Amino acid sequence: VGYGVYDVYDLGEFDQKGSIKTKYGSKDEYLDAIIALKQAGIESYADIVLNHKMGADALQTIPATKVDWSNHNIETSQRENVKVATKFTFPGRKHKYSDFEWNWTDFDGIDYNNQTGENAIFKFVDKKWGAEVDEEFGNFDYLMGADLDFSNPRVVKECKDWGRWYLDLTKVDGFRLDAVKH
């Protein structure tokens, strides 16, 4: 929930990250609100962020290069190993709804090296920023957190599977996709 997305399958149902409810309430309260809107003749649209993830369950050490904050196409360092928050296992959900676990290969960059405490944009070696994005900052694929790599077919499939699950469960009328220019 919000811009710091952790588990898109958790609508306030699982004990994760110190809470069950989201900041907006429980899964049942959310579904009841959608039903009430429909009964009042009001369409409902889910505000979704599929650009990045935050709050990983484990760290991974991977090769990356730093890129310039003002132009993400310019690499500013040699290849180095960075310890990054890219392993998402969702232990509180215990694979309910999806057994997909995210790892560094599902992302193309991140903004923090947990080993050194350095804040920088780290592009993962052998990864490319997305092509169909805003040209602000040279290439505005990277925004924050662990940036999803939509050139990875497994990422695309998981996002589509999640979308079908979400629509089937919530019966919302559609989505407002946030951060799509990234």
Each language-model region and where it sits:
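Short catalytic-loop micro-motif centered on adjacent basic/acidic residues
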Residues: 174-180
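Substrate-binding/active-site clefts of carbohydrate-active enzymes
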Residues: 1-165, 169-170
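Acidic-and-aromatic substrate-binding clefts and catalytic sites of carbohydrate-active enzymes
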Residues: 22-23, 180-182
